[in-house]
Structure formats: structure tokens, C-alpha cells
Amino acid sequence: MANFIKPYNDDPFVGHLATPITSSAVTRAILQNLPAYRFGLTPLLRGLEIGLAHGYFLMGPFVKLGPLRDSEIGLLAGFLSTVGLIVILTLGLTIYGVAAFGQEKTQSSNENDLQTKKAWDQFKGGFFVGACGSAGFAFICLSSIPSFITN
């Protein structure tokens, strides 16, 4: 174990954040497959894919743990709560985009990065459409299960 833990570049005064877990090939492969880091995706498709995941998994807690979970409209209330949270998240993305990029007219050399106002707006739009669409898909899937229709 003494040979495994040693200072970075044999200098005890220089630190770094690489650990055996964070610098492993498996972790690097998992992170490179996330839509935020995947090569070749447009900002719209990044937002769409991230929104699809978020809208789908946000539906469950609102349906099963919401205040109207035992009523006849529990599923609809969960869906509307999910859409409400998606709107709030999209407003948060909008506020971040205005604060970070403002009204600047800089042109990026790479159209697929999220460091411009235009790319951030595309990402935000894709997120909203994907999240609302997947929440609607989850609503349709859950409404077709008889145990969710009648309690």
C-alpha cells in the first residue's frame, strides 16, 4: 500500500483530484457516454436527451408520494406537478443563460458546445420538449396499468 499512495509527480506540495476511482477507464467511459460530454451531439439533442430522462423519472415521486396519491386524480395531479417542476427547471436554465451569456454576440468555433447564448437556448428548448414529452409518455404508460386507475 505504501507504493500505491505517493505524491503527484513526486512533489508533496502539489495536489490533484485524481483517485483510483475517478481516473479509472471504467469511470471515464461512463462519463464520456453521458449526453453532456458525448462528442458530436448538437445542443438541441443534448437538451432533448437530458430532458427525456428527467421528465420520465420525475413523474414517479409525484404520483406515488404526492398529496393526492390516494385520490382518483392522483395520476393527473402527479403529471401536472411534474410539468410544473419542469417549467420551474426550464426557468432556472433561462435565468442561468441570461446571467452567464447575457447579450454577447461572440461566435464560437465549435457549434456543439454550450458556451454561447444560441447553443444554450437550443439546449433549454430541447430540455423542455424532452422533459414534457417523457412525462406525458410516463402518464400514458401509468394510466394503462389498471392498478393506477382504480385504487
UniProtKB/Swiss-Prot annotation:
Entry membrane topology: Multi-pass membrane protein
GO annotations of cellular component type: chloroplast thylakoid membrane; photosystem I reaction center
Coiled coil: none
InterPro entries linked to this entry: PSI_PsaL, PSI_PsaL_sf, PSI_suXI
Keyword Membrane assigned: yes
Residue ranges of the TM segments: 48-68, 73-93, 125-145
Pfam family, one: PsaL
GO biological process: photosynthesis
Cell compartment(s), UniProt: Plastid, Chloroplast thylakoid membrane
The keyword Manganese is annotated on this UniProt entry: no
Keywords: Chloroplast, Membrane, Photosynthesis, Photosystem I, Plastid, Thylakoid, Transmembrane, Transmembrane helix
UniProt cross-references to HAMAP family, sorted A to Z: PSI_PsaL
Family: Belongs to the PsaL family.
Name of this chain's protein: Photosystem I reaction center subunit XI
Organism, as annotated: Phaeodactylum tricornutum (strain CCAP 1055/1)
